[in-house]
Amino acid sequence: MSEIDAQKVAQRIDTVLDILVAGDYHSAIRNLEILKSELLDHTNAGNTADSAQPKAPWEV
């Protein structure tokens, strides 16, 4: 498994912040969802879905 490049993650977070400042909240949220998905895929490459935390009621 490769290491997570913190610099690239920070750059992507900066991009999301720029999108938020521009007022495009939908795109910012979508970019955060993509980043989250990629990070989880990276860290859970060998894990099963059974170990996932249950979702809070507002996330269901």
Swiss-Prot record:
InterPro entries annotated for this entry?
A: UPF0509
Pfam families, alphabetized: YciZ
Provide the family line: Belongs to the UPF0509 family.
Name of this chain's protein: UPF0509 protein Ent638_2183
Q: Which organism was this protein described from?
A: Enterobacter sp. (strain 638)
